[in-house]
Amino acid sequence: MKKVIKLIVVIFTILLGYICVNSAIIYNYLREYGYGINELPKTVAVWMRVSAGFTVAESDNADFFIGRSYSGYYKKMCEKKGYYVEQMGRDMIATNSQKRYESIYFSPDIDVWCHWFRLYEICSNDGKITIDEFRKLE
């Protein structure tokens, strides 16, 4: 019984150390890109695939969010929601004339990228949309 508990403690310690080391690296990148400790827990959730992304800045017609480093995730998300996705280089345009937002534009920031996360811009011709609103679309 003691060996099992010891093994569980060792595995838990290794996992916790792995998450802490990666969190420190993520925080370093966040600081480099102008963000801080407030964004760290949500960014770690994005890295661990618990979250699809979260808003970090807004403008009149666009939402800037930290999302997953693999942009294909958002392409698949659009397709599951019934959008037709065209990819032009790094930018994606999702269209569906039957939806509230007929076209949604995703653009990853080429300069703000690392293994753990990427900064994206999302906007629509039919009004402002945030990543949270997009996730809730049917």
PLM regions and their residue ranges:
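N-terminal Sec-pathway targeting helices
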Residues: 1-16
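Intrinsically disordered, low-complexity prosegments and terminal tails associated
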Residues: 2, 33-40, 129-138
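Intrinsically disordered, low-complexity regions enriched in Ser/Pro/Gly/Gln/His and often acidic
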Residues: 11, 40, 76, 105-109
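Short hydrophobic helices that act as membrane-entry/anchoring signals
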Residues: 2-6, 31, 42-46
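Non-cytosolic head/periplasmic domains of membrane-anchored proteins
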Residues: 89-138
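Membrane-interface motif at the C-terminal end of an N-terminal transmembrane signal
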Residues: 14-35
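Short linear interaction motif-like sites in intrinsically disordered regions of transcription factors
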Residues: 2, 48, 114-117
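Mature extracytoplasmic domains of secretory-pathway proteins
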Residues: 39-97
